[in-house]
């Protein structure tokens, strides 16, 4: 790739990012409302045609936000798993990571809980479902691996525990979005974790 081609690629990438950031901002500023491409273009000071030069459809813009979430969250989860070998601590850090990511990205949170996808293609809801399925699988894998190392292996409700942890995360995100982003998903988290920790003692 020549220097000129590299520069063009960087400019294209920065414009992609600017569009996605603008969409996330619009979702944050107008909770519960459907964001149109005309509205998005106006916020960026460009034409709708300019948007479509970078994204073939609004659905692809939403997919871009979901992909950003996947890359960010699961990249950090890999780091947690690599650096911490304690199963309970891993679960705590992953849950806190998800809640913190949500708090920092209100607009994206509305995509992940599905409220921003009303009237959009079913493919997007499937992508979001895959995101949370993957998160639950991560919890399940951590707990299963820990169970296999315990003296009295077996008998622990690994699947149910993983699903409970996921449900707590999803519930906090739902509350955050439903409150119009006023109730932080991290509100009261330290106290709530102490309660969750009592459930996970069987994996300690």
State each model region's role.
Residues 64, 78-104, 158-165:
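Hydrophobic alpha-helical connector segments
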Residues 27, 62-69:
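Alpha-helical DNA-contacting segments of helix-turn-helix folds
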Residues 45-55, 61:
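Short hydrophobic/aromatic patch on the recognition helix
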Residues 1-43, 60:
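Basic, helix-initiating cap at the start of DNA-binding domains
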Residues 71-74, 122-148, 159-163, 187-197:
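Amphipathic alpha-helical packing segments from all-alpha helical-bundle domains
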Residues 103-126, 174:
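Amphipathic alpha-helical segments used for helix-helix packing
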Residues 27, 32-33, 53, 82, ...:
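Helix-turn-helix/winged-helix DNA-binding modules
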Residues 100-104, 108, 141, 162-183, ...:
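Amphipathic C-terminal alpha-helical segment
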